[in-house]
From Swiss-Prot:
Spans traversing the lipid bilayer: none
Family statement drawn from the similarity comment of this UniProt entry: Belongs to the UPF0210 family.
Gene3D superfamilies noted in UniProt: 3.20.70.20
CDD domains: RNR_PFL_like_DUF711
Higher taxonomy: Bacteria, Bacillati, Bacillota, Bacilli, Bacillales
Subunit structure: Homodimer.
Protein name: UPF0210 protein lwe0494
PANTHER family given in the database record: UPF0210 PROTEIN MJ1665, UPF0210 PROTEIN SPR0218
Amino acid sequence: METNQILETIRMIEEEKLDIRTITMGISLLDCMDGDGEVARKKIYQKIVTKARNLVAVGEAIESEFGIPIINKRISVTPIAIIAGSSADTDYVEFAKTLDAAAKEVGVNFIGGYSALVQKGYTKGDEILIRSIPQALAQTERVCSSVNVGSTRTGINMDAVRQMGEVIKETADLTADTQGLGCAKLVVFANAVEDNPFMAGAFHGVGEADCVINVGVSGPGVVKRAIEKVKGEPFDIVAETVKQTAFKITRMGQLVGQVASEKLGVPFGIVDLSLAPTPAIGDSVAHILEEMGLEMVGTHGTTAALALLNDAVKKGGVMACGHVGGLSGAFIPVSEDAGMIEAVQQGALNLEKLEAMTAICSVGLDMIAVPGDTTAETLAAMIADEAAIGVINNKTTAVRVIPASGTKVGDMVEFGGLLGTAPVMPVNDKSSADFIARGGRIPAPIHSFKN
C-alpha cells in the first residue's frame, strides 16, 4: 500500500468523519417460543445476553486496533409478533421490557425487532403487538419497533396503514414529555428487508442464520470532499468519483465485519451501503447534493442528483464487498442532517419533495416532525403514499414521522445525539379521512407476477 493511500485513509477518518455507523448482531429467537410467556421471556433474555455478551467489547477492541470509529453496537431479533404469538399472553409490553433489559445488560444502544409483518394480513400475534407498540415504546429506552404494511408481491394492507396512523399518534402522546421520542423509534415499511443493520427498522428475518453480524458504513463527508475536487466536471466524472470513494468506504466496512465475525465466532452477513448522515457539520447527505451544483437541497434537480449519488454508491460498494444487503441507499433523515434542517428552515425543502426523493433512496419520510394536531388519518395517508412508491417500484420505502404534541409549524423539536433536531414541517390541510376509512387491501401491481 502506498503512503498517500494510508494518509488518505487517516484524513477520511479524522477530517471527513468516516466511520462505521453500526455493527449489528442479528439473533434468531425462533427457539425461544413457548406457550408460557414468562418462560419465553426468560429464554429470550438468556439467548440475547449469551450471544451478544462480547459484542460491545469486540467493537471497542476493533476500534482501537484499527483506529476506525465504530459509533453504535446494536442487536436485531426475530419479529416479536412471531415469537410472542405462540404464548397465551394478551399484551406484549413485557416482551419489550425483556428486550430492553437484555440490551442494557450487554451495553448496546438499541435493540430492534419489536416488529410485525402484516403486508397481507394479521395473525393473533401481529394484532396484539401492534396494539401494544405505544406502551412498549413509552416504557422502554432502547427498544425499536417496525411494521411492514405492504410489499410488491402482496400489495398494501390498508387496514394496517390506518392502524399505524393511530399508533404513531398515540405513541407521540405517550412520549410527549420527550417531544414524541417514541415515534423516532418506530418505522412503517413497505418491502422491509430481513438483514437491515440500521435502526429503527432492523429486525432479524426468519430466513436468516441463528446469529449473524451485519455492518452499516457511513461517509457523507468523504463523498462531499471527493466531489469538491471535480467541480464543474460533467456528471460522468462525478459518478466515477463517487464510485471510487464508495469502494474505499465499503472496503472498511467489509474489514470490520470480517474481523468482528471472527472474534465473536458468528457468521458475517452483509455490509449495508447506505450513506447515513449525522447532525454534525461535514456529515451531511444534503451537502453532497449541493456540492453537485444545487444552491440548496430541495430545489429542482435534487431528485436527479440523489439518483446519481445513490446509484454510484451502490456500484462502487458492490465491487468492494462479497455480500451487500440491508437498505443500501442514501438516507435523508431531516433531523439528522444539518443540510436538510437548513433547507426546511429556508423553505426550500418540503414534504412533497421528500416524497419524490423516496423514489430514489431507502427511507423517504424519515425523522420528520409535523404539527402536534396532525390527524391519525393524515399520518396514515402519508404512510400509504410512501408504501405505494415502494410497492409500485419494487423497492423498500418507509416512514418515520413525529407528530410532536403541542408543536406548530416552525417550532424546533430537540431529540439530541444522533437523532438531532427537527423543524416542524407543514402538512396539507385537506382531509384524507374518507380515503383511509375504506380499509381493505390495495392489490399487488401487475408487474409483481414474475413466476
